Structure formats: structure tokens, C-alpha cells
From Swiss-Prot:
Keywords: Cell outer membrane, Ion transport, Membrane, Porin, Signal, Sugar transport, Transmembrane, Transmembrane beta strand, Transport. This is Maltoporin. The lineage of its organism: Bacteria, Pseudomonadati, Pseudomonadota, Gammaproteobacteria, Enterobacterales. The record marks 143 as: Important in sugar transport. The record marks 31, 66, 99, 252, 385, 447 as: Greasy slide, important in sugar transport. Gene3D superfamilies: Porin, LamB type (2.40.170.10). It comes from Cronobacter sakazakii (strain ATCC BAA-894) (Enterobacter sakazakii). Homotrimer formed of three 18-stranded antiparallel beta-barrels, containing three independent channels. CDD domains: Maltoporin-like. Involved in the transport of maltose and maltodextrins.
Length: 448
């Protein structure tokens, strides 16, 4: 009995050590932003985005509280073989009250197995919901290559001259498909599965400090058995991507060329859309039946550079032309810079200047917007990428819009529903007109 009692403290200590080791192995990562702002003409902070533009310049121009909370852990390891479990829950609220209830979005839940195939050392096989090899322009929060969703694949297969990745993901689309029951009664399905098949060849060393990544995505609607899509629904499409990344000191430059067809032109990032036919012709979702047959061309140059000890700068230039057979496409180009002057290793001043120009294919009219933000910031480090950051800001925006999208009524009583129309069409007001505004506030931003 005495021996048993003497062993008890040792057993407790060992178990405590095991649990402590397990607890420390949990990876807690994430992103969050939140703040408070006001509008010069009164009321809460407004945010400014040109009608038809796919994104907006974000510094001093974000009006929500948003967070992604990631928990992950390497749950098994033997030699160089391992399994990793990863999760991500995201939240977004309007930051107008203390208590703002919201249903979180379960963005990620996947398992990644590394070096499990002896013939393919260094590769990873995975399955589940995942943020998959996303490519974005941080300044405008624009994801130009992103097939995230439930899926499976194998990545980083070393071919000697580059690394191969293959994946399949899904994004179901509201609107759905229909089947005939009897006596002219149709049963409408609430969603249609859109499958995407993605192949990438990366890490191609093409010049000193420069690498090339090539990719192709094919997306298609996958209607249930005995269901059908609308006659004019877009059923499939392709997207081709080439991205060159050049190291410039401690910074980088990325040059991107993308070409997409049909179903992959709407979101323009590799996910398929355009298969739905709607619940009924009185439901706004019926507008999804407007097909997006056509093509998209996109050119992007963006990056971040350091100019001495005191100056950093982000920049972006982009041209995007969506040409649809139904003439409801757009031609959008944007250019912006965000220089940063560092007073101390943790205090800086930032100036963001951005311009958007969006021309409607249908109306031949143009919307444009200028946006300027001056911010004083305290951040954890002396890089333009250092976070967390606390900032106070003032933003000025001026816009002149000649067209907008007609969302009057519903598709059953408005033949133009969802289409671009000129401002003043049928006596209505479409777009934001010619105006300007300024806002000011404070914000925190963090990633870890």
C-alpha cells in the first residue's frame, strides 16, 4: 500500500506532463478585424465600392467585425509521416452593437497526411473542407484563384523540375434544378452541386529569384438524377492561370494572367457558377438562369517592396474584361498604392490611394471611384505586413456612376431584372450617382 501511494505522485506528474505536451501541440491561428467609424455627413461608417467592381480598397474602408479562428493539431507522427487535423470557424457582424448574434460559418475541417506514399516523398494527401492554395491581393481583399470548399486531393508531388497538385472541390449553388412531377407541376431543388477539378504545377524556377506556377480548372454543374437545368443555364467552363513570382529584396512582385470561359467567369477565381434555374420565376434566385456564357481575361501585377529602412509599399494594378453573350459583362481596371513611413519600429503612417473604373458591356457607360485613406498605425514590428495593428484613419471617396443593376420587382414582372441599365432608366435611379463622402474611425487588425 505504501509503495502504491509513493508511486501515485509520480503517475500524476507523468500524466500531467503528457496532457501538457498534448495541449501545447494544439495550433491556434487566425485572423480578425474590428473597429468603430463615423461618416462625415452623419451616422455610422460607410464603406465605398464602385458598382460592378469585384473588390474595394480596404484600408480605412471596412465596416464589419470579421474573424477566423483556426484550431489544428498534428495528431499522429512516425518518422517523417504525419496526420494533421485542421479546422476554421468564421464570424462576421455589422459592429453596430455590443450583442450581435450570428451563425458562424464552418469554413474548414480537414485532415492532411504528409509523406504517406513512399513513392511520392514530400507529398500531402488530404480530404475535407479546406482553404486550398488561395491566391489574393491583400490591398483589395481580392481572391483571384480560390477553389476552397469540401474536397480532396494530393499536393506538392515533387517532379524534379516542379511540384504537382491535383484537387477536386465543390460549391453548391442556390437556384438549383427542377424535375417534372405531373400535370405541369414541377419540383424545384434548392441547390445544384458545382464540381471543380484543379491541376497545378508550381515551383518552376524560370529565372534567378523567380518562380512560375501554371494551373487549369474545370467546373461543371452536377444535377441530381431526373433533374434538369434551365435551357440557358451555363453548365460548365474552364479557367487557365499563369503566375510569376519574383523576389525583390525582402519583398515580392506577382504577375498573373488568367483566362476563363462560361461557368468560371462569374466568380472568376476557379469556382463554377451559372447552373441554377430558381425556385420560381418570382424568386430573385431565378436571376441565376441568366447565363454567363462568354469569356474572361484578367491581368494582375501586385506586390510589396521595401525602400530603405523607413519606407515600405504595397501596390496593385489590374485589368479584367468579362465578355458575356448576354451583354451583361463588365470591363474593370484598378490601380492603387499603399506607402508606409516608419517613424519607429512600431509606429508608422500609411497612405492608401486607389482608383476603380468599371464599364458596362450592356450600357456602354462607366462607373469610377477615387478613394484616399490616411492612417496612423502602431504595429508589432517594422514591416508593412506586421500584425497586430492598431490604427486611426480618415478616408475620402469620390465617385461618378452612370449605370447600375436593375433589381426592381422580380424576374416574373421585370424582364431587365439583374441586368445592367443606365442611370435614369424608366425614370429610376441606378448606380450611386455623382457624389463624395468622408469617414473617420479606428480599427484593429490581427493575424497569427
Amino acid at each position: 500500500m505504501m509503495i502504491t501511494l509513493r508511486k501515485l505522485p509520480l503517475a500524476v506528474a507523468v500524466m500531467a506532463g503528457i496532457f501538457a505536451a498534448q495541449a501545447s501541440a494544439v495550433d491556434f491561428k487566425g485572423y480578425a478585424r474590428s473597429g468603430i467609424g463615423w461618416t462625415g455627413s452623419g451616422g455610422e461608417q460607410q464603406c465605398f465600392q464602385a458598382t460592378g467592381a469585384g473588390a474595394k480598397y480596404r484600408l480605412g474602408n471596412e465596416c464589419e467585425t470579421y474573424a477566423e479562428l483556426k484550431l489544428g493539431q498534428e495528431v499522429w507522427k512516425e518518422g517523417d509521416k504525419s496526420f494533421y487535423f485542421d479546422t476554421n470557424v468564421a464570424y462576421s457582424v455589422a459592429q453596430q452593437n455590443d450583442w450581435e448574434a450570428t451563425s458562424p460559418a464552418f469554413r474548414e475541417a480537414n485532415v492532411q497526411g504528409k509523406n504517406l506514399i513512399d513513392a511520392l516523398p514530400g507529398s500531402t494527401i488530404w480530404a475535407g473542407k479546406r482553404f486550398y492554395q488561395r491566391h489574393d491581393v491583400h490591398m483589395i481583399d481580392f481572391y483571384y484563384w480560390d477553389i476552397s470548399g469540401p474536397g480532396a486531393g494530393i499536393e506538392n508531388v515533387d517532379l524534379g523540375f516542379g511540384k504537382l497538385s491535383v484537387a477536386a472541390t465543390r460549391s453548391s449553388e442556390a437556384g438549383g434544378s427542377a424535375t417534372f412531377q405531373s400535370d405541369s407541376i414541377y419540383d424545384y431543388n434548392k441547390s445544384t452541386a458545382n464540381d471543380v477539378f484543379d491541376v497545378r504545377l508550381g515551383s518552376l524556377e524560370v529565372n534567378p529569384g523567380g518562380t512560375l506556377e501554371l494551373g487549369v480548372d474545370y467546373g461543371r454543374a452536377n444535377a441530381r438524377d431526373d433533374y434538369y437545368l434551365a435551357d440557358d443555364a451555363t453548365k460548365d467552363g474552364w479557367m487557365f492561370t499563369a503566375e510569376h513570382v519574383q523576389t525583390i529584396g525582402t519583398g515580392f512582385n506577382k504577375f498573373v494572367v488568367q483566362y476563363a470561359t462560361d461557368a468560371l467567369t462569374s466568380q472568376g477565381k476557379g469556382l463554377s457558377q451559372g447552373s441554377g434555374i430558381g425556385i420560381s420565376d418570382t424568386d430573385p434566385k431565378f436571376a441565376y438562369a441568366q447565363n454567363n456564357n462568354g469569356h474572361m481575361l484578367r491581368l494582375i501585377d501586385h506586390g510589396s517592396i521595401s525602400m530603405g529602412d523607413r519606407w515600405d509599399m504595397m501596390y496593385v494594378g489590374m485589368y479584367q474584361d468579362i465578355d458575356w453573350d448576354n451583354n451583361n459583362g463588365t470591363r474593370w481596371w484598378t490601380v492603387g498604392v499603399r506607402p508606409m513611413f516608419k517613424w519607429t519600429p512600431i509606429m508608422s503612417t500609411l497612405l492608401e490611394v486607389g482608383y476603380d473604373n468599371v464599364k458596362s458591356q450592356r450600357t456602354d457607360e462607366t462607373n469610377n471611384q477615387y478613394k484616399i485613406t490616411l492612417a496612423q498605425q502602431w504595429q508589432a514590428g517594422d514591416s508593412i505586413w506586421s500584425r497586430p495593428a492598431l490604427r486611426v484613419f480618415a478616408t475620402y471617396a469620390k465617385w461618378d456612376e452612370k449605370w447600375g443593376y436593375d433589381k426592381t420587382g422580380n424576374p416574373s414582372n421585370n424582364a431587365n431584372y439583374g441586368y445592367a441599365v443606365k442611370d435614369g432608366f424608366n425614370g429610376g435611379s441606378f448606380g450611386r450617382g455623382d457624389n463624395d463622402e468622408w469617414t473617420f474611425g479606428a480599427q484593429m487588425e490581427i493575424w497569427w
